[in-house]
Structure formats: C-alpha cells, structure tokens
C-alpha cells in the first residue's frame, strides 16, 4: 500500500459543535465534535443525508457562523480572527441558489463577484480586469460575456456562478450541491471543469454532493457526514462501501463495474 503524501494544511475543523436555538426554547444540535482537515490542493467530496449538517459546515468555514465549541482555522489562524472581507476574498462559495440582479450582462456580474472586496460595485483596476478575464475563460464562460443572466440556461448559469467565484482568486472553493439543478450531462461537465480548475489553479475544493457515484468519480477523497459527525473519510473505494451506505443512507447497494472496469454502486436487486 502506498503511503499517503501529507499536504500543507489550508483549513481545519477540530472538535466543532454547532446548534440552533428553536422557537420553543429547545436547542437542536447540528454538528457534534466534527473533525476535518483540508490540505492545499485537496479535492474532497462531502456527502450525507439531508439535515446532516453539510451546509452548516460550509458556513462555518466561511466565518458566517461561529462554532459553539471547537476550532475552525484557515491558513493557520482562527476564522474568527480574520477580517470578513479578507476571508471572503480567499474563500469562495458556489451556493445551491443565488438570486442574480436583473439587467446585467455576464461580464458585469463577474466583475461584481470580484469587486465587493474592494468596496466598489464594478472591478476597475488592471488587476481586476485580468482576474475577471481569466475567471471567464477558466469557467468556460467567455462566449457568455455579453449575454444577460436571465437569458442563460441552467448549465450556463452554473458557469457564470463558477466565474464569479473564481474572480475572487480564492484559495478555497466551497461548492454546495452545485449539480442539483442540472441534468446528468451538465453535472459531469461541471465537475470535470472543477477538477481541471483545481489542477490548473492549485485550488483546494470541498464539494457537497448528493450523488454517491458522482462523488466517487469526482474526488479522490470522500467524507461522510452523518447525524452531525464525520463517520468516514478517505478514498471512495474505502469509504463508499455497501455496508456504510446501508448504515448511513438506509439504502441497499451492491458494488458493480462499468463496461470499462470502473467501480460504481448499484441498487441492490431484491
């Protein structure tokens, strides 16, 4: 067995607990003693059932939420010590849903994705222009630059959102179920583009995904969040086993092979 190569830590969640106070005065625990480390250049898929705390974990990494217990670090410093604009530039988020303003062209929206960290509406410096142009190219959105956002298809809209995130020139890219509104062909295309960007830019990527086979094909490392805890973390073949899937997701699956020999999970035939 080949030993794993250690990478320099970029972000870490250590012993983190988080919960919400409900309207009736009770407390709902969402995360319980979560541990997750992301090295520079890591590509990790985060999977779990609905309500297991995946989106909450992303919000803790952005500093939008603060943990009730434990520590969240980015680049060696507690997230709480970072100035929000500084952290927001280095940690980009591709959300499940983002309401875009009407009447703006794609290039203008990508400029907005770059500019808020400089306290202005549109990018204006030469460095801004280079970052916006590169973001459009890397996201495969150059041909969309003069289109209005409301004219875009689902797949084109996702390319716009990727470009807006890349315009920040982040170190960490967080994806919250980026494929949820796409058909299979566009899901595969988007994830392939993210893989390419990770390799090209050296990004660290943490992607919340709901399709286990897509997660296994996308990332060399998969973490499973169940009932507020990371219950498995490692290569897909070690983590996404039939017994783990049955225990966490309550679904009976079998390991199968595609025609070209790739492993995948198939529903168990009764």
Task: Give the location of each predicted region.
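The feature captures the beta-strand-to-loop junction immediately N-terminal to the Walker
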Residues: 47-49
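Helix-to-loop junction immediately C-terminal to a conserved catalytic motif
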Residues: 62
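Conserved ABC transporter NBD signature motif
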Residues: 70-78, 87
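Conserved ABC ATPase "signature" region
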Residues: 111, 126-144
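Conserved ABC ATPase signature
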Residues: 123, 148-152, 156
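Conserved catalytic motifs of ABC-family nucleotide-binding domains
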Residues: 169
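Catalytic Walker B motif of ABC-type/P-loop ATPase nucleotide-binding domains
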Residues: 173-177
């Amino acid at each position: 067995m080949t030993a794993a190569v250690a990478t320099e830590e970029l972000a870490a969640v250590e012993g983190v607990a988080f919960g919400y106070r409900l309207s009736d005065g009770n407390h709902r625990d969402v995360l319980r003693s979560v541990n997750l480390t992301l090295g520079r250049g890591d590509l990790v898929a985060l999977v779990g059932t609905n309500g297991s705390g995946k989106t909450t974990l992303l919000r803790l990494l952005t500093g939008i939420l603060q943990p009730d217990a434990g520590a969240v670090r980015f680049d060696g410093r507690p997230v709480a010590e970072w100035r929000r604009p500084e952290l927001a530039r280095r940690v980009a988020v591709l959300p499940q849903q983002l309401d875009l303003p009407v009447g703006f062209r794609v290039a203008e929206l990508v400029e907005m994705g770059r500019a808020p960290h400089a306290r202005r509406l549109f990018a204006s410096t030469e460095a801004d222009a280079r970052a916006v142009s590169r973001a459009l190219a890397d996201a495969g959105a150059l041909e969309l630059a003069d289109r209005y956002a409301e004219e875009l298809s689902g797949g084109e809209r996702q390319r716009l959102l990727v470009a807006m995130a890349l315009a920040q020139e982040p170190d960490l890219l967080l994806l919250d179920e980026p494929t949820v509104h796409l058909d299979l062909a566009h899901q595969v295309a988007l994830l392939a583009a993210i893989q390419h960007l990770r390799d090209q830019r050296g990004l660290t990527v943490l992607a919340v995904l709901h399709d286990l086979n897509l997660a296994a094909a996308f990332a060399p490392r998969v973490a499973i969040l169940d009932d507020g805890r990371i219950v498995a973390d490692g290569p897909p073949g070690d983590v996404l086993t039939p017994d783990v899937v049955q225990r966490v997701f309550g679904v009976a699956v079998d390991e199968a092979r595609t025609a070209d020999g790739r492993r995948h999970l198939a529903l168990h035939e009764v």
